[in-house]
């Protein structure tokens, strides 16, 4: 949530001179829909329409950047996967090497790009990352019970990142 409510709005303020509260208020309906559906893909039509109306993003930018972002810009998912893998390693008492940390970083970025924008899809990719660095996948059972609310929050971060990128690109293009 740091990304959605502090980092992105601060960069919006720096690059577009838009007030932080104004930006958060404008994207809140998008975030609310993302939270309730847990799907970047399901929110895409509303995200495109609402970002044009409330953020003033041009139709050209919205129709190119937002679908691309809904597919590959899964920053909430990437952060989640890295945190889960490291958390489970700590639970099992596994000391990770620097190489393993960089492997986790690299794989979570790649896995987040390949994660479908549907609820629960990141669990499969997290298993892949865990097995590639030698962490027992059984540990994921500790997270699965609370994955749904976490998925809802990840989706909020993902769509906020999409609107952030679209806003910056639209500002730079005009």
Map each language-model feature to its residues:
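Residue-level signal for transmembrane alpha-helical positions in Major Facilitator Superfamily
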Residues: 2-6, 43, 80, 121-122, ...
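Alpha-helical transmembrane segments of multipass membrane proteins
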Residues: 3-8, 73-76, 111, 150, ...
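Juxtamembrane/transmembrane-helix boundary motifs in multi-pass membrane proteins
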Residues: 17, 21, 25, 95-99
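Flexible, glycine/charged-enriched surface loops at secondary-structure junctions
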Residues: 20, 57, 62, 156, ...
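Transmembrane alpha-helical segments and their short flanking loops
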Residues: 82-174
